[in-house]
Curated annotation (Swiss-Prot):
Coiled coil: none annotated. It comes from Geobacillus kaustophilus (strain HTA426). GO terms for molecular function: rRNA binding; structural constituent of ribosome. This is Small ribosomal subunit protein uS19. It holds the Pfam family Ribosomal_S19. GO terms for cellular component: cytoplasm; small ribosomal subunit. The gene is rpsS. Protein S19 forms a complex with S13 that binds strongly to the 16S ribosomal RNA. Belongs to the universal ribosomal protein uS19 family. It comes from the Bacteria. One of its GO terms (biological process) is translation. Keywords: Ribonucleoprotein, Ribosomal protein, RNA-binding, rRNA-binding. InterPro entries: Ribosomal_uS19, Ribosomal_uS19_bac-type, Ribosomal_uS19_CS, Ribosomal_uS19_SF.
Amino acid sequence: MGRSLKKGPFCDEHLMKKIEKLNATGQKQVIKTWSRRSTIFPQFVGHTIAVYDGRKHVPVYITEDMVGHKLGEFAPTRTFRGHAGDDKKTKR
C-alpha cells in the first residue's frame, strides 16, 4: 500500500533544509544522508545526494525521472554476486 494522499509525500526536514539552502545559493555539492525513506521532490533535481546503503554512501545524481521515488531505491543494500555456474560444461 502506498502513502495516503491526505498526508502527502514525506521528506526528512534536515534534508529539505540542506537542499533549499543549496538552491538559494546556487551551489552544487554532494549531500550525505542516511534518509533512504525520503521522497525525491522536484527541488532535488540536479543535485547529487550520497545515500547510505549500510556500508558506504552511494552517490545518486537526481534527474527528473526520479521525482516521486524514494532515495533508497537508487542505493541497493545487497550485493548480487550471480547465480551458481553451470557444472555441465566443466564435466566434459
